Amino acid sequence: MTDLSQHTPMMQQYWKLKNQHLDQLMFYRMGDFYEIFYEDAKKAAKLLDITLTARGQSAGQSIPMCGIPYHAAEGYLAKLVKLGESVVICEQIGDPATSKGPVDRQVVRIITPGTISDEALLDERRDNLIAAVLGDERLFGLAVLDITSGNFSVLEIKGWENLLAELERINPVELLIPDDWPQGLPAEKRRGARRRAPWDFERDSAHKSLCQQFSTQDLKGFGCETLTLAIGAAGCLLGYAKETQRTALPHLRSLRHERLDDTVILDAASRRNLELDTNLSGGRDNTLQSVMDRCQTAMGTRLLTRWLNRPLRDLSILQARQTSITCFLERYRFENLQPQLKEIGDIERILARIGLRNARPRDLARLRDALSALPELQQAMTDLDAPHLQQLAQTASTYPELADLLQRAINDNPPAVIRDGGVLKTGYDAELDELQSLSENAGQFLIDLEAREKARTGLSHLKVGYNRVHGYFIELPSKQAEQAPADYIRRQTLKGAERFITPELKEFEDKALSAKSRALAREKMLYETLLEDLIGHLAPLQDTAAALAELDVLSNLAERALNLDLNCPRFVAEPCMRIEQGRHPVVEQVLSTPFVANDLALDDSTRMLIITGPNMGGKSTYMRQTALIVLLAHIGSFVPAASCELSLVDRIFTRIGSSDDLAGGRSTFMVEMSETANILHNATDKSLVLMDEVGRGTSTFDGLSLAWAAAECLAQLRAYTLFATHYFELTVLPESEPLVNNVHLNATEHNERIVFLHRVLPGPASQSYGLAVAQLAGVPGKVITRAKEHLQRLETTSLPHEQPRAKPGKPAIPQQSDMFASLPHPVLDELSKIKVDDMTPRQALDLLYTLQTRL
């Protein structure tokens, strides 16, 4: 809207505010409702399933409108945020009684998916992250902020592959990118991607705003002074947070410099296939998180999720965690701590809301209870002798003065919001007590005053009353009015009665008529002062929250180690991966029968296992359990194995399962090849690689050739590789690649039924049992019978159309099959002409070497 003069004063005010937020929905406060107008109304009515109506006219046109009660706004906001919408909250700041024209309004807050802090709008078990990225194809700066905890980090990343892998790990709900980036870049395809003006990322202004935020002269103390791109991204994030919150952000106290070299990198496909915290259906059941999480606090659960999604390569941190878990297991110490931790609650997010000055009364009540529980928690930690646990216990100190302040201030069961009062205890503030007493006890005061005045004057028909026009009064019948004391001031004459006021009643009137509103204003002021007092202690309180969250995770991992029979892995300098009696931590929990544990041995003499065996035999489970054991070891956890000895890995890759990307125009085979290409380009001799059925999405010869070449490449890279395949031809790889060995998952048939034994044994499988699996799956018997006929033919001839179709029940004429019969090779011709008996051993050896170079 450009010409506002045609609009009513109310709509002029609306458009002046709306024009600053054209791409966001605006909730416009009018009395007890948030009204939504024009295109916003049409969109909101559809998204929220509420009635779209119209409100009068402005500029000659009716105004589309819908509305929601302001006291019920949270539920509607939650729905809009889940749908990825941003909402501008515009409140009345003027007094309708004194305003000339429209009541003054202003934007007090902008709610976006990445900057929400209200408890009702958040998933308590997951971080709510917003990220900003700046750079080009070679180098990117990434900044990540969790406004609900104050965690703020930066890192610089080389190349798109690493950036996309990191974005997959942090999974931000909003991603800010520069507006001058070309359209259609991979990062923009993520949900919540928003373009921001290029100057929002400008390095010098970003550096200045960050130094102001942290009250420092430079960023050297955070180790990121030279990270030009990351600083630009962090400055954009900080500006966006301030723009949406419309307040200072005292809970953002530092900037953490993260490095990819410190972590085990997992790409998007690997995270999806390993089902760390989300299963393949998008739910949370039967994930690694669901099995490993028995944390007592929501902040502990979120920290565990961060650990699972960011395994570390820092041996000192991993060993400190292992030692801590061992300490908790001694004399079952975790059992003493966990009940105490349960009393703490989610103070991490409560403190963030205090910093944002939007903490609710019940937040302060929960903080009060948490601070009151800290002394007993400290007592439970006195015998923890692991150095890391002692450090955490020291950080999680007690706050007796704050606990006492909140104990004196906040009612035991305060209301949800400060709006209607009733939050602060009687006795906390004398003036508030008096105002509340006046407001609540006015009736009793009038009864007492009437009794006292009757006794003082001797006028038995005296009455004390109130009306809205004249206020409080003392009423006497006309006959007794002449006997009124001298301090009675005439206020109103009625037929048959006179009304008076006294100095005492006038004083009470002045207090009582404004007592309620003054009490509410006083209580709100005291509440805000209380928040400011707490903000002054935010830094140590946030450190305490972080320490308690880590104590929660470590005690949880100790409990899991005991109840899931997990053992401590041992990190060694020698390159190896040796697992005895390893188990899949998730599958083991859902099976009704005992899980079959298996061994794994990879080292400098064996870097790859070619895994064969029947479908449903357990190949994928064996591979996934290896990856999960390695991942758990790299978060410092104990692992589901009798013993585990390994060296640090740098990446975990998985090429497992089949899926397409229809939206991206990629077939199942294209997705498979893209994942394979990523592995072959980025795997090193410190990487763990899981490859399952590579090449099955194309023709037999193409697929086999690709699988063979990929396996050879990985063997030469010396990556720790588990390569599952149904191409039996690959089992000859150990003959040419000395670092490759064969293993298989065994099965047996009994009464024409397959029995899976799930045991990993040396050597290749003898058969695949494909028809037996099909029969087990319920494929009709006649189809199985016909398949057996085709199988007999295919086992004795290269292609089915090369032989006439046999009559039912009669197999085709047996012939020796050769998978490569249709691919003649000149070396084969030359071999067929060699007269072996006429050659010396030396000549034969030389010829073999020559022929080998031609293969």
From Swiss-Prot:
Q: Which Gene3D superfamilies match?
A: 1.10.1420.10, 6.10.140.430, DNA repair protein MutS, domain I, MutS, connector domain, P-loop containing nucleotide triphosphate hydrolases
Q: Establish whether keyword Transcription regulation is in the entry.
A: no
Q: What does the record list as GO biological process?
A: mismatch repair
Tell me which residues bind ATP. G613, P614, N615, M616, G617, G618, K619, S620
- PROSITE patterns found in the cross-reference section: DNA_MISMATCH_REPAIR_2 (PS00486)
Q: Which UniProt keywords apply?
A: ATP-binding, DNA damage, DNA repair, DNA-binding, Nucleotide-binding
Q: Does the keyword Cell membrane apply?
A: no
What are its GO cellular component terms?
Answer: cytosol
Question: Where are the residues of the annotated region Disordered?
Answer: 796-817
**Which GO molecular function annotation, any one, does this entry have?**
damaged DNA binding
Q: Which InterPro entries match?
A: DNA_mismatch_repair_MutS (IPR005748), DNA_mismatch_repair_MutS-lik_N (IPR007695), DNA_mismatch_repair_MutS/MSH (IPR017261), DNA_mismatch_repair_MutS_C (IPR000432), DNA_mismatch_repair_MutS_clamp (IPR007861), DNA_mismatch_repair_MutS_core (IPR007696), DNA_mismatch_repair_MutS_N (IPR016151), DNA_mismatch_repair_MutS_sf (IPR036187)
Which SMART domains does the record cross-reference, listed alphabetically? MUTSac, MUTSd
Q: Organism's domain of life?
A: Bacteria
Q: What does this protein do?
A: This protein is involved in the repair of mismatches in DNA. It is possible that it carries out the mismatch recognition step. This protein has a weak ATPase activity.
Q: Which family does it belong to?
A: Belongs to the DNA mismatch repair MutS family.
Q: What is this protein called?
A: DNA mismatch repair protein MutS
